[in-house]
């Protein structure tokens, strides 16, 4: 099976973008995994699919598959690339589009400087909405927020980390670290991602605060491992930091792949806004194995 694709990246978070506006490709999880494979396929953190929307007032459907082939609710860096793609391909002439995701409707906006701002919706901190099983745990209050003790491992190797849990349409667990470069992401990231208290698994964020307007962040993404950047992870980390009284309303987030700017008023009823780059890397076509 031969398909055309566009390779894009936003702050180093890289994507294969597929156009299904003229018909479904009908790919299987195994075929998504093949596309994402960096040795045999194109290579990507996620596969993004553009589909027409049947709903009035919605321009497109935005479908996201992780590198493991599983469909997920949201991807912030991908949303910026999605908006850049549909505009560059002439699928819309609008600067602001309304896009349906599994997590709800988002509204990416192309800015005059070439970046893209996305209304990512409001953050949710209720453990049940993340979802996070908080039964039997005592939270530690700080500012208007709270952190939860999360036990990792068992026996002599067990450790407890304090995490703020946030949903940005997908689940996040954010922990504060003194030095993000020294954070044990490769070791504890998988333990947090698959922790039994997160029934849908979770994205694990490691947040270093430099001052009230600047942070550094690494994220071990659910179904993808550590990536160079995670847009929803940046939104979740900043929202958690503001909620805990540690950050101001506008924060520059330095990831290993580049800079994102996150803005949130601190009002739980209001949206988080993310601004960052979206770049086309190359286009091509690839033969992928037919579905069994």
From Swiss-Prot:
UniProt site positions, description: Could be important to modulate the pK values of the two catalytic cysteine residues: 172, 221
Classification via PROSITE patterns: DAP_EPIMERASE
Active site: 75, 230
Biological process, per Gene Ontology: lysine biosynthetic process via diaminopimelate
Record's GO cellular component terms: cytosol
Keywords: Amino-acid biosynthesis, Cytoplasm, Isomerase, Lysine biosynthesis
UniProt-listed Enzyme Commission number(s): 5.1.1.7
Family annotation (InterPro entries): DAP_epimerase_AS, DAP_epimerase_DapF
Coiled-coil region(s): none
Protein's pathway: Amino-acid biosynthesis; L-lysine biosynthesis via DAP pathway; DL-2,6-diaminopimelate from LL-2,6-diaminopimelate: step 1/1
GO molecular function: diaminopimelate epimerase activity
Compartment list: Cytoplasm
Function: Catalyzes the stereoinversion of LL-2,6-diaminopimelate (L,L-DAP) to meso-diaminopimelate (meso-DAP), a precursor of L-lysine and an essential component of the bacterial peptidoglycan.
NCBIfam families recorded: DapF (TIGR00652)
Family of this protein: Belongs to the diaminopimelate epimerase family.
Designated name of the protein: Diaminopimelate epimerase
Taxonomic path: Bacteria, Pseudomonadati, Pseudomonadota, Betaproteobacteria, Burkholderiales
Gene from which the chain derives: dapF
């Amino acid at each position: 099976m031969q398909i055309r694709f566009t390779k894009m990246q936003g702050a180093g978070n890289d994507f294969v973008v597929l156009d299904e506006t003229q018909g479904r490709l009908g790919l299987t999880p195994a075929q998504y995994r093949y596309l994402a494979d960096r040795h045999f396929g194109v290579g990507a953190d996620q596969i993004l699919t553009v589909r027409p929307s049947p709903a009035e007032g919605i321009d497109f459907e935005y479908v996201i598959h992780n590198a493991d082939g599983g469909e997920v609710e949201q991807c912030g860096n991908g949303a910026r690339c999605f908006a850049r793609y549909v505009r560059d391909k002439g699928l819309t002439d609008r600067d602001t589009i309304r896009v349906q995701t599994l997590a709800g409707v988002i509204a990416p906006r192309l800015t005059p400087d070439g970046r893209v701002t996305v209304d990512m919706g409001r953050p949710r901190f209720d453990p049940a909405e993340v979802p996070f099983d908080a039964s039997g745990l005592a939270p530690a209050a700080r500012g208007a927020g709270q952190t939860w003790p999360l036990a990792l491992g068992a026996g002599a190797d067990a450790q407890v980390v304090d995490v703020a849990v946030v949903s940005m349409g997908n689940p996040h667990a954010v922990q504060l670290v003194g030095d993000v470069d020294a954070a044990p992401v490769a070791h504890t990231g998988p333990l947090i991602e698959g922790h039994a208290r997160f029934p849908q698994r979770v994205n694990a964020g490691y947040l270093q605060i430099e001052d009230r307007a600047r942070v550094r962040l690494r994220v071990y993404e659910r179904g993808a491992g550590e990536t160079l950047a995670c847009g929803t992870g940046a939104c979740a980390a900043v929202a958690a930091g503001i909620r805990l009284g540690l950050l101001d309303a506008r924060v520059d987030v330095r990831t290993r792949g580049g800079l994102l700017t996150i803005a949130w008023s601190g009002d739980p009823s209001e949206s988080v806004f993310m601004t960052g780059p979206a770049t086309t890397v190359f286009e091509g076509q690839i033969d992928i194995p037919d579905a069994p």
